[in-house]
Swiss-Prot record:
Protein's gene: RFS
Reaction(s) the record says it catalyses: alpha-D-galactosyl-(1->3)-1D-myo-inositol + sucrose = raffinose + myo-inositol
Temperature-dependence annotation: Optimum temperature is 45 degrees Celsius.
Pfam families: Raffinose_syn (PF05691)
Organism for this UniProt entry: Oryza sativa subsp. japonica
Protein name: Galactinol--sucrose galactosyltransferase
Role played: Transglycosidase operating by a ping-pong reaction mechanism. Involved in the synthesis of raffinose, a major soluble carbohydrate in seeds, roots and tubers. Specific for galactinol and p-nitrophenyl-alpha-D-galactoside as galactosyl donors. Able to utilize sucrose, lactose, 4-beta-galactobiose, N-acetyl-D-lactosamine, trehalose and lacto-N-biose as acceptors. May also act as a glycoside hydrolase.
Length: 783
C-alpha cells in the first residue's frame, strides 16, 4: 500500500515555504480550479481529488535549494487498486516536448500543444516558457512534469483524449499491491533554463527518493575514451574466438586498433526447453539472430566455442590483450535475467529459476509491435527469485572477472515489469534485481564497468542507477529496416539521431549517454560518425571483419585506440527542443557540446520518417525528406556549461573547411540535403596584446578529425624572448588549424621550427603523432 502522508502535510498545500531564510509562496499553486506556476495557469479544470505538495515540505531547502522551485502531485482515489488512471488537468495551446516509450525498451521525442497530443507511456514533459510578460511575475517559466515512483507504484503520463485532459497513470504491476492515497507520484519543477531545469529537478527527486545517484556523482567507465569494436553485426550469434581475433587484427593493421572489444550475444551457454540438460548439448548453434529469445541460460561458463579455446575465455582474453596492447577493455553481453529467456529451471550450478508468463500492461500493449517481446511473452522467462538475484550476478560476474573481462553490457533490462505479479510488483522486483547487479558490479567491475541497454523507462533510471554510469540512449542501430522498407536504410538513421539527442536530455542526469555502434561502410556512415564524434560518449563500430572505411575511422580514432571526446554529453539546441526534426519537413536537428577551449555544433538533416500515432510504429515519411535550411549561432552553445565563451568567435566548418567570424548574437545559414551533416567548431577569439599590436587568436583543432576542437587540450598566451606567443597543447596528429588576425612570424612544433600556411586568417601546421594520446604536442605561434 502506498504510504499515507499525514494530515499535517496536506495542510501545507498552497502555504508559504522558507527559501534562503525568507518566507516565500510556493511557485506552484492551485488557483481556483487551475494549476498555476508563478501565477500562470498551465493545467486547467484540475479535478478536486488532485493534491499539490510543495517539494520543500518533503525535501528541506537546506539539503537541496532547488526544492523551492518544485512541487509534487498526488491524488486521493475512492478505492484501493493496483492501477489508477487519473486526470490531472487540461493542457491547451501550450507547446511541449516529451519523452515517451514507443517500444517496451526504448523511448523517443514527441511534441505537441494540447493534452490530446500527449503520447502513451510519457516519461517526461517540458512545457515551453511563454513569450509574454502579462503577469507581474514575468513570463511563464519552463515547467517540467516528471512521473516518478511512490512506494511500490510507478507513474507515467498519457493523453486523456477527451477535452485535452492529461492523465497520470500509476501502477504497481501486481494485483496484490494496491493503494488509494498518493502524494508524490509526479514531480513539477519550474525554471528559466531548460537544461538546468532538468538537472535541478533530478537533484530534488534524488534527495526525495534516495534510490539512485546522479551522473554528476559518478564517473563513467574508461571505455568512453576508447575506440571500440562490437561483434554483433559482424557475427550475430555465430561469434567465435578466431573471428574476434581476426577482427581486431584487421582494424589494427589498418591503423585503427580498438581500445575496447565488446563480445556481444553468442558467447553464452544456452538451450531450448526441449533440450535434454543431461546430454551436454548446447543450443547456440541451433538458433539464429532474432530467434534466440526462447532460449535460456544453462551455465555461467562460456559456450563450447570459447570454452574449447586453449585456456577457455580467460585464455583467449589474455592472449588477445597481449597481442594487441591497445585493447585495454573487453566487455561481454548478457541479459538482465541472464539470457533472453532467463535461466533454465533445474540447470546444475545455477540458482533456482521458475518460468513466469510475462504480462503486458495496458500501456505496453499500445507500444510498437516487437517480435522480441512477442517471443518472450509466448515462451516465458526463467526468473530467479528476487531474494536470490545476487547469486545470479555473483556467479556470472565472478567467472567473467576471473576470465579477464572488464565489464558487461546488460541488455533486455525492462523485462521485470512484465513478470512482477507474484513478486510484490514492479518496483520491489526491480529494487531486488538492481541491488544485486549494483553489488556485483562494485565487486567485480570497478563499480562502473557496465553499459545499460534496453533500459528506457523511469523504473530503471530511478531505481537502477546507483552504480551504473553509462547507458544506451537510442534504439538499436538498424543498418536496414527489419520490416523490409528499402528506404529504412536512410530514414531509420535520422530516427536514431533524434532518439539519442533528445533522450539524453532526460537520461543524461542519471547515466552518461551512449549513442550505440554503427557500421563504417553503411551508406549513412559519415552521418553516424559525425554524431558519435560530438556525442561525448564512446565511439564503437560493428563492422564485419575486414570491411572498414579507414579514411572515415581515422577521423574518429587515434592510433592508440583512443578518441577525441567532448567534455560533456551532446543535447539539442534550445531552438530544437519543441520542434520536430523527423517529419515536419523544415526542422534541422542541431546539437551542442563543449570541448576544453571551444564549443561544437552538429547540424543534421534527419527528416524522412518517425513515429506514426495512427499506425503505432515508426514509418517512412518520404515527403518530408527534403533539403532543410536553418541558422546556426555561437549562442546555440550553452557556454555556462564550459568551452570558454566570449563575445567574438571563430566558427570553423569541419566539412566545408571554411572559417567565419561571428559575434555571439550573429548567425550563419546552413542548408543540408537529407541525411547529411555539418560540424561547427565555435572557438572564442582571445586578444593577444603586445606593445606593438593587438592580435585575435583562437585555436580550432585538428581539421582531419570530426571532433576537431577536441584535439585542443591546452591554450595560453605568453611573452617569450620578447615575442608574443600563443601556445597550444594538441592531442592527436594531423593538420592543426587556428584563427589568427595577423600572420605569425614563426611556428614551432615540439620546439622545432615548422612550416605553416596562412590564408584568410587561418593558420595551418602539421602535427606529428607522438606515439601516445597521453603525450601532447606543443604548437607555438610567435608574433
Amino acid at each position: 500500500m502506498a504510504p499515507n502522508l499525514s494530515k499535517a502535510k496536506d495542510d501545507l498545500i498552497g502555504d508559504v515555504v522558507a527559501v534562503d531564510g525568507l518566507i516565500k509562496p510556493p511557485r506552484f499553486t492551485l488557483k481556483g480550479k487551475d494549476l498555476a506556476v508563478d501565477g500562470h495557469p498551465f493545467l486547467l479544470d484540475v479535478p478536486a481529488n488532485i493534491r499539490l505538495t510543495p517539494a520543500s515540505t518533503l525535501v528541506p531547502n537546506s539539503d537541496v535549494p532547488a526544492a523551492a522551485a518544485g512541487s509534487f502531485l498526488g491524488f486521493d482515489a475512492p478505492a484501493a487498486k493496483d492501477r489508477h488512471v487519473v486526470p490531472i488537468g487540461k493542457l491547451r495551446d501550450t507547446r511541449f516536448m516529451s519523452i515517451f516509450r514507443f517500444k517496451v525498451w526504448w523511448t523517443t521525442h514527441w511534441v505537441g500543444t494540447n493534452g490530446r497530443d500527449v503520447e502513451n507511456e510519457t516519461q517526461m514533459m517540458i512545457l515551453d516558457q511563454s513569450g509574454t510578460k502579462s503577469s507581474p511575475t514575468g513570463p511563464r517559466p519552463y515547467v517540467l512534469l516528471l512521473p516518478i515512483v511512490e512506494g511500490p507504484f510507478r507513474a507515467c503520463l498519457e493523453s486523456g483524449k477527451a477535452e485535452d485532459y492529461v492523465h497520470m497513470v500509476l501502477e504497481s504491476g501486481s494485483s496484490t499491491v494496491r493503494g488509494s492515497v498518493f502524494r508524490s507520484a509526479v514531480y513539477l519543477h519550474a525554471g528559466d533554463d531548460p537544461f538546468d531545469l532538468v538537472k535541478d529537478a533530478m537533484r530534488v527527486v534524488r534527495a526525495h527518493l534516495g534510490t539512485f545517484r546522479l551522473m554528476e556523482e559518478k564517473t563513467p567507465p574508461p571505455i568512453v575514451d576508447k575506440f571500440g569494436w562490437c561483434t554483433w553485426d559482424a557475427f550475430y550469434l555465430k561469434v567465435h574466438p578466431e573471428g574476434v581475433w581476426e577482427g581486431v587484427r584487421r582494424l589494427a593493421d589498418g591503423g585503427c586498433p580498438p581500445g575496447l572489444v565488446l563480445i556481444d550475444d553468442g558467447w553464452q551457454s544456452i538451450c531450448h526447453d526441449d533440450d535434454d540438460l543431461g546430454s551436454g548439448a548446447e543450443g547456440m548453434n541451433r538458433t539464429s539472430a532474432g530467434e534466440q529469445m526462447p532460449c535460456r541460460l544453462i551455465k555461467f561458463q562460456e559456450n563450447y566455442k570459447f570454452r574449447e579455446y586453449k585456456g577457455g575465455m580467460g585464455g583467449f582474453v589474455r592472449e588477445m590483450k597481449a597481442a594487441f596492447p591497445t585493447v585495454e577493455q573487453v566487455y561481454v553481453w548478457h541479459a538482465l535475467c541472464g539470457y533472453w529467456g532467463g535461466l533454465r529451471p533445474g540447470a546444475p550450478g545455477l540458482p533456482p529459476a521458475k518460468v513466469v508468463a510475462p504480462r503486458l500492461s495496458p500501456g505496453l500493449q499500445r507500444t510498437m509491435e516487437d517480435l522480441a517481446v512477442d517471443k518472450i511473452v509466448n515462451n516465458g522467462v526463467g526468473l530467479v527469485d528476487p531474494r536470490r538475484a545476487r547469486e545470479l550476478y555473483e556467479g556470472l560476474h565472478s567467472h567473467l572477472q576471473a576470465s579477464g573481462i572488464d565489464g558487461v553490457k546488460v541488455d533486455v533490462i525492462h523485462l521485470l515489469e512484465m513478470v512482477c505479479e507474484e513478486y510484490g510488483g514492479r518496483v520491489e522486483l526491480a529494487k531486488a534485481y538492481f541491488a544485486g547487479l549494483t553489488e556485483s558490479v562494485r565487486r567485480h567491475f570497478n563499480g562502473n564497468g557496465v553499459i545499460a541497454s534496453m533500459e528506457h523507462c523511469n523504473d530503471f533510471m530511478l531505481l537502477g542507477t546507483e552504480a551504473v554510469a553509462l547507458g544506451r540512449v537510442g534504439d538499436d542501430f538498424w543498418c536496414t529496416d527489419p520490416s523490409g522498407d528499402p528506404d529504412g536504410t536512410f530514414w531509420l538513421q535520422g530516427c536514431h539521431m533524434v532518439h539519442c539527442a533528445y533522450n539524453s536530455l532526460w537520461m543524461g542526469a542519471f547515466i552518461h549517454p551512449d549513442w550505440d555502434m554503427f557500421q563504417s561502410t553503411h551508406p549513412c556512415a559519415a552521418f553516424h560518425a559525425a554524431s558519435r564524434a560530438v556525442s561525448g560518449g564512446p565511439v564503437y563500430v560493428s563492422d564485419a571483419v575486414g570491411c572498414h572505411d579507414f579514411d572515415l575511422l581515422r577521423r574518429l580514432a587515434l592510433p592508440d585506440g583512443t578518441i577525441l571526446r567532448c567534455e560533456r554529453y551532446a543535447l539539442p539546441t534550445r531552438d530544437c527542443l519543441f520542434a520536430d526534426p523527423l517529419h515536419d519537413g523544415k526542422t534541422m536537428l542541431k546539437i551542442w557540446n563543449v570541448n576544453k577551449f571551444s564549443g561544437v555544433l552538429g547540424a543534421f538533416n534527419c527528416q524522412g520518417g518517425g513515429w506514426s500515432r495512427e499506425a503505432r510504429r515508426n514509418m517512412c515519411a518520404a515527403g518530408f525528406s527534403v533539403p532543410v535550411t536553418a541558422r546556426a549561432s555561437p549562442a546555440d552553445v550553452e557556454w555556462s556549461h564550459g568551452g570558454g565563451g566570449g563575445d567574438r568567435f571563430a566558427v570553423y566548418f569541419v566539412e566545408a573547411r571554411k572559417l567565419q567570424l561571428l559575434r555571439r548574437d550573429e548567425s550563419v545559414e546552413l542548408t543540408l540535403e537529407p541525411f547529411t551533416y555539418e560540424l561547427l567548431v565555435v572557438a572564442p577569439v582571445r586578444a593577444i596584446v603586445s606593445p606593438e599590436l593587438g592580435i585575435g587568436f583562437a585555436p580550432i583543432g585538428l581539421a582531419n578529425m570530426l571532433n576537431a576542437g577536441g584535439a585542443v587540450q591546452g591554450f595560453e598566451a605568453a611573452r617569450k624572448d620578447g615575442d608574443v606567443a600563443a601556445e597550444v597543447a594538441v592531442k592527436g596528429a594531423g593538420e592543426m588549424v587556428a584563427y589568427s588576425s595577423a600572420r605569425p612570424r614563426l611556428c614551432k612544433v615540439n620546439g622545432q621550427d615548422a612550416e605553416f600556411k596562412y590564408e584568410d586568417g587561418i593558420v595551418t601546421v602539421d602535427v606529428p603523432w607522438t606515439g601516445s594520446s597521453k603525450k601532447l604536442s606543443r604548437v607555438e605561434y610567435f608574433y
